[in-house]
Amino acid sequence: MRKNIFLEDSASDEGRINKGAAKILFGKVYLTKGDFQKAKDKLAEVVEHESEYGFGLHKDYHANWLRDTEAGIEAVLYIEYKEPPFQHNGEMALAGPKYSIPGSLGISALNEADIPTQELYDQFDNRDLRKKTNFKTEFAHLKTGEILKSSIPLSGKFWVEGLETGDRCDVNMHIIRYADAILM
Protein backbone atom coordinates (compact mmCIF):
# COMPACT_ATOMS: atom_id res chain seq x y z
CA MET A 1 0.00 0.00 0.00
CA ARG A 2 1.26 3.48 -0.82
CA LYS A 3 2.58 5.51 2.09
CA ASN A 4 0.72 8.60 3.27
CA ILE A 5 3.00 11.60 3.06
CA PHE A 6 1.40 13.91 5.60
CA LEU A 7 -0.73 11.46 7.56
CA GLU A 8 0.31 8.97 10.18
CA ASP A 9 -0.13 5.49 8.77
CA SER A 10 -3.02 3.78 10.51
CA ALA A 11 -6.07 1.72 9.65
CA SER A 12 -8.23 4.83 10.04
CA ASP A 13 -6.34 6.52 7.17
CA GLU A 14 -7.54 3.98 4.61
CA GLY A 15 -9.30 5.83 1.84
CA ARG A 16 -7.90 9.24 2.76
CA ILE A 17 -6.18 11.32 0.11
CA ASN A 18 -2.45 11.98 0.52
CA LYS A 19 -0.38 15.05 -0.37
CA GLY A 20 0.70 13.71 -3.78
CA ALA A 21 -2.87 12.92 -4.78
CA ALA A 22 -3.96 16.41 -3.70
CA LYS A 23 -1.28 17.95 -5.93
CA ILE A 24 -2.41 15.82 -8.87
CA LEU A 25 -5.99 16.97 -8.29
CA PHE A 26 -4.82 20.60 -8.23
CA GLY A 27 -2.96 19.98 -11.48
CA LYS A 28 -6.13 18.64 -13.07
CA VAL A 29 -8.09 21.68 -11.86
CA TYR A 30 -5.51 24.03 -13.37
CA LEU A 31 -5.61 22.06 -16.61
CA THR A 32 -9.41 22.24 -16.71
CA LYS A 33 -9.28 26.00 -16.13
CA GLY A 34 -6.80 26.38 -19.00
CA ASP A 35 -3.91 27.49 -16.78
CA PHE A 36 -1.46 25.15 -18.45
CA GLN A 37 1.74 26.43 -16.82
CA LYS A 38 0.33 26.06 -13.30
CA ALA A 39 -0.95 22.59 -14.23
CA LYS A 40 2.45 21.58 -15.57
CA ASP A 41 4.26 22.92 -12.50
CA LYS A 42 1.90 21.31 -9.98
CA LEU A 43 1.92 17.92 -11.74
CA ALA A 44 5.72 18.05 -12.07
CA GLU A 45 6.00 18.32 -8.28
CA VAL A 46 4.69 14.76 -8.10
CA VAL A 47 5.81 13.22 -11.40
CA GLU A 48 9.44 14.31 -10.98
CA HIS A 49 9.50 12.90 -7.43
CA GLU A 50 7.06 9.99 -7.79
CA SER A 51 8.86 7.65 -5.42
CA GLU A 52 8.70 10.24 -2.62
CA TYR A 53 4.92 10.26 -2.99
CA GLY A 54 4.61 6.50 -3.43
CA PHE A 55 3.40 6.65 -7.03
CA GLY A 56 4.56 4.75 -10.09
CA LEU A 57 3.27 2.49 -12.83
CA HIS A 58 2.44 -1.18 -12.37
CA LYS A 59 4.58 -3.44 -14.54
CA ASP A 60 1.35 -5.23 -15.44
CA TYR A 61 -1.43 -2.84 -16.54
CA HIS A 62 -4.04 -5.43 -15.49
CA ALA A 63 -2.90 -5.07 -11.85
CA ASN A 64 -4.97 -1.87 -11.67
CA TRP A 65 -8.12 -4.02 -11.64
CA LEU A 66 -7.04 -6.91 -9.40
CA ARG A 67 -8.29 -7.02 -5.82
CA ASP A 68 -4.82 -7.33 -4.28
CA THR A 69 -3.19 -4.50 -6.26
CA GLU A 70 -5.96 -2.13 -7.40
CA ALA A 71 -5.23 0.32 -4.54
CA GLY A 72 -1.54 0.26 -5.43
CA ILE A 73 0.99 2.67 -6.83
CA GLU A 74 -1.22 3.90 -9.70
CA ALA A 75 -4.29 4.64 -7.57
CA VAL A 76 -4.66 8.41 -7.10
CA LEU A 77 -8.41 8.78 -6.66
CA TYR A 78 -10.89 5.93 -6.83
CA ILE A 79 -14.15 4.63 -5.45
CA GLU A 80 -13.50 1.72 -3.10
CA TYR A 81 -15.85 -1.23 -3.35
CA LYS A 82 -16.03 -4.18 -1.00
CA GLU A 83 -17.61 -7.60 -1.10
CA PRO A 84 -21.21 -7.83 0.15
CA PRO A 85 -22.72 -6.87 2.51
CA PHE A 86 -20.81 -3.65 1.73
CA GLN A 87 -21.35 -1.47 -1.33
CA HIS A 88 -20.29 -3.21 -4.52
CA ASN A 89 -19.60 -2.16 -8.09
CA GLY A 90 -22.27 -2.92 -10.69
CA GLU A 91 -19.92 -2.52 -13.67
CA MET A 92 -19.58 -6.27 -14.23
CA ALA A 93 -23.35 -6.48 -14.62
CA LEU A 94 -23.32 -3.62 -17.13
CA ALA A 95 -20.45 -5.09 -19.15
CA GLY A 96 -21.26 -8.79 -18.95
CA PRO A 97 -22.57 -10.67 -21.99
CA LYS A 98 -26.29 -11.25 -22.30
CA TYR A 99 -27.15 -11.27 -25.99
CA SER A 100 -23.75 -11.59 -27.67
CA ILE A 101 -22.96 -15.17 -26.65
CA PRO A 102 -24.66 -18.42 -27.62
CA GLY A 103 -26.55 -19.44 -24.50
CA SER A 104 -26.01 -18.39 -20.91
CA LEU A 105 -22.97 -18.18 -18.64
CA GLY A 106 -24.97 -19.25 -15.60
CA ILE A 107 -24.38 -15.81 -14.06
CA SER A 108 -27.36 -13.66 -13.13
CA ALA A 109 -27.79 -9.88 -13.53
CA LEU A 110 -25.80 -9.40 -16.76
CA ASN A 111 -27.15 -6.57 -18.90
CA GLU A 112 -24.60 -5.99 -21.68
CA ALA A 113 -25.20 -2.24 -21.49
CA ASP A 114 -21.66 -0.79 -21.56
CA ILE A 115 -20.45 -1.91 -24.97
CA PRO A 116 -17.25 -0.49 -26.45
CA THR A 117 -17.40 0.27 -30.15
CA GLN A 118 -15.77 -2.04 -32.66
CA GLU A 119 -13.81 1.00 -33.86
CA LEU A 120 -12.26 1.46 -30.40
CA TYR A 121 -11.45 -2.24 -30.16
CA ASP A 122 -9.79 -2.16 -33.58
CA GLN A 123 -7.57 0.77 -32.51
CA PHE A 124 -5.68 -1.54 -30.15
CA ASP A 125 -2.94 -3.60 -31.75
CA ASN A 126 -3.14 -7.29 -30.80
CA ARG A 127 0.36 -6.97 -29.28
CA ASP A 128 -0.82 -4.16 -26.99
CA LEU A 129 -1.04 -5.78 -23.55
CA ARG A 130 -3.81 -3.37 -22.51
CA LYS A 131 -6.18 -4.91 -25.09
CA LYS A 132 -6.62 -8.12 -23.08
CA THR A 133 -7.58 -6.10 -19.96
CA ASN A 134 -9.74 -3.46 -21.64
CA PHE A 135 -11.76 -5.89 -23.74
CA LYS A 136 -13.12 -9.39 -23.29
CA THR A 137 -14.42 -11.64 -26.03
CA GLU A 138 -14.36 -15.04 -24.34
CA PHE A 139 -16.23 -15.98 -21.19
CA ALA A 140 -16.17 -19.19 -19.14
CA HIS A 141 -19.49 -20.75 -18.12
CA LEU A 142 -19.75 -20.59 -14.32
CA LYS A 143 -20.63 -24.27 -13.82
CA THR A 144 -19.16 -26.13 -16.82
CA GLY A 145 -16.12 -24.00 -17.63
CA GLU A 146 -17.11 -24.07 -21.31
CA ILE A 147 -15.67 -21.07 -23.16
CA LEU A 148 -18.32 -19.01 -24.94
CA LYS A 149 -17.23 -16.46 -27.53
CA SER A 150 -18.97 -13.09 -27.69
CA SER A 151 -19.92 -11.80 -31.13
CA ILE A 152 -18.71 -8.33 -30.06
CA PRO A 153 -15.91 -7.13 -27.77
CA LEU A 154 -17.10 -6.20 -24.28
CA SER A 155 -15.42 -4.30 -21.45
CA GLY A 156 -13.05 -6.51 -19.50
CA LYS A 157 -11.68 -4.37 -16.65
CA PHE A 158 -14.45 -5.21 -14.20
CA TRP A 159 -14.97 -8.87 -15.07
CA VAL A 160 -14.29 -11.21 -12.15
CA GLU A 161 -14.28 -14.93 -12.90
CA GLY A 162 -16.33 -17.11 -10.58
CA LEU A 163 -18.96 -14.60 -9.43
CA GLU A 164 -22.48 -16.01 -9.50
CA THR A 165 -24.11 -12.63 -10.07
CA GLY A 166 -22.80 -9.73 -12.13
CA ASP A 167 -23.91 -7.04 -9.72
CA ARG A 168 -21.60 -8.17 -6.88
CA CYS A 169 -18.26 -7.07 -8.34
CA ASP A 170 -15.90 -5.43 -5.84
CA VAL A 171 -13.34 -4.04 -8.31
CA ASN A 172 -12.58 -0.39 -7.57
CA MET A 173 -13.64 2.37 -9.97
CA HIS A 174 -10.59 4.48 -10.83
CA ILE A 175 -11.29 8.18 -11.24
CA ILE A 176 -7.68 9.30 -11.63
CA ARG A 177 -4.75 6.93 -12.06
CA TYR A 178 -1.11 7.97 -11.84
CA ALA A 179 -0.81 7.26 -15.57
CA ASP A 180 -3.33 10.09 -16.07
CA ALA A 181 -1.09 12.46 -14.10
CA ILE A 182 1.85 11.59 -16.35
CA LEU A 183 -0.24 12.21 -19.47
CA MET A 184 -1.56 15.52 -18.14
Predicted segments — roles?
Residues 2, 16-143:
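An aromatic- and glycine-enriched ligand-binding surface/loop that stacks and positions planar moieties
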Residues 3-14:
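Flexible helix-coil transition and linker loops at the boundaries of alpha-helical arrays
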Residues 10, 19, 113, 162-165:
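Hydrophobic alpha-helical segments, principally membrane-spanning helices and signal/leader peptides
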